Amino acid sequence: MLQPKRTKFRKTHKGRNRGLANSGNEVSFGTFGLKATSRGQLTARQIEAARRAMTRHVKRQGKIWIRVFPDKPITEKPLEVRMGKGKGNVEYWVCPIQPGKVLYEMDGVPEALAREAFALAAAKLSVQTTFVIKTVM
C-alpha cells in the first residue's frame, strides 16, 4: 500500500480540508480521468482497492496513473483507553481530497471500457466522482 518512505514529523495536526483543488485538477497524462466532485479523504487501502478493480477490469491493457498519494498520517488510540496520555499511534495514511482533483487517469483503452473501469473504481472510494476526458487545446 502507498505510504511515505520517510517524513519530517511522525504525527500531524488534524487540519481543515477547505477550498477547491487548484493543482492536479486537469487530465495531464492519460486520455480519460476520474475526478472528485466532493470533498473527503481517501485512505491508502481505498486507493489500492480502486486501482486493483480498474486494472482487473481492463485486463492489464492500457496504462493507469494514480494521481493522489496518501501523505497524511491518521492516529488512533487503542480501545478502552482513557482520554489524555498523549496522541495515539499512527494507524493509517490518507490523502485529503478537494472537489476538482483528478484521482486516476487511463490511456490506451476504448472510452466505454474506461467508463466501466472507473465506475468500478468509484464504488471503492469514499468521495463522489465523475468521468472526464482530456481537453485538447
Curated annotation (Swiss-Prot):
Task: List the GO biological process terms.
Answer: translation
How far does the signal peptide extend, from start to end residue? none
Protein's UniProt keywords contain GTP-binding: no
Q: Which domain of life is it from?
A: Bacteria
* Coiled-coil ranges per UniProt: none
Which CDD domains does UniProt cross-reference here? Answer: Ribosomal_L16_L10e (cd01433)
Q: Which HAMAP family match?
A: Ribosomal_uL16
This one is known as Large ribosomal subunit protein uL16
This protein's encoding gene? rplP
